Amino acid sequence: MNAVRREQRYSSAMKAARYWHLRDDGLIECDLCPRHCRIADGKYGICRVRQRQGDKLIAASYGLICGLAVDPIEKKPLYHFLPGSSVLSFGTVGCNLTCTFCQNFHLSRANRIEGTRTTPEEIAEAAIAHTCASVAFTYNEPIVFLEFAVNTAKVCHERGLKSVAVTNGWMEPEPRKEFYAHMDAANVDLKAFTNQFYQELCGATLQPVLDTLVYIRHETNVHLEVTTLLIPGRNDSPAEIDAMTKWAVSNLGPDVPWHFSAYRPTLQWSEAPPTPLESLLQAKSIAEHNGLRRVHLGNVRIAS
């Protein structure tokens, strides 16, 4: 990963958040994702970046970015969108899921809101300076910094750049509509195909993610690719892969690109071993047998 600029730390910028309402009991309810956090004054939602201040909800991480880098677009992974081009990638901190196996735990569950204070214009200028064709909202969940992502995407479009989201897809319909109105491509993590997995390992539910996939595919012009991180003994059974890929063909079509990626244990969670190559190859075989035409394997080397 090539660093674009040196990170400097600042206290969080404050920006009014959208998608919330004041309840009769005096709590603010966030309407951004299906969790619907109920937030007391001075407290944060579970994402750790949307904070109540008085009778308003604040997007506390607005304009504070982490990990600014130039990547090949294939690293997102997007194999069928502007292939061979470079993308300027960045994230912030925070996430609306609590995945125990998160590969970017230091960002998604960060205890402090910090980063490099940056404007949408500066991001677009950096992308152009590094001959990137697009900008990617990645590393953490972009829906929790929707306001900054949308504003940045608008500026990027004005400068001739595309906007890319790497996302868990767990969002409510109204913010989803606004968010994807400004995206050109998305890679959505479908973490498993059982509600039990989402509840036990992510603190979430499956159906809203499926709804997002169908929405992107059928109600937008956004290019869609899907990634599933295969965790041994958790979501890699042939029966689950069979059900998942049959659903994909029926609801998203046979041409949706699908990436099966290998899990690697982290310091935070090592309850499963690394994904064996055999599991990835088996998933690919099942997916192709069920009709998916663009199946890729990630985070693994295959001997030629």
Named regions from a protein language model:
Residues M1-D41, G233-S304:
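Auxiliary Fe-S-binding modules of radical SAM enzymes
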Residues D31, V93, L97-T100, K154, ...:
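Core alpha-helical elements of the protein kinase catalytic domain
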Residues V4-T92, F105-R109, A303:
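N-terminal [4Fe-4S]-dependent radical SAM core
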Residues P120-T275:
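Conserved AdoMet/S-adenosylmethionine-binding subsite of the radical SAM
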Residues K43, C95, T194:
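A generic "binding-loop/recognition-motif" signal
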Residues P83-V93, L97-H130:
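Glycine-rich active-site/cofactor-binding loop and its immediate structural neighborhood
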Residues P83, T116, C202-T205, P276, ...:
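Short, conserved glycine- and acidic-residue-centered signature motifs
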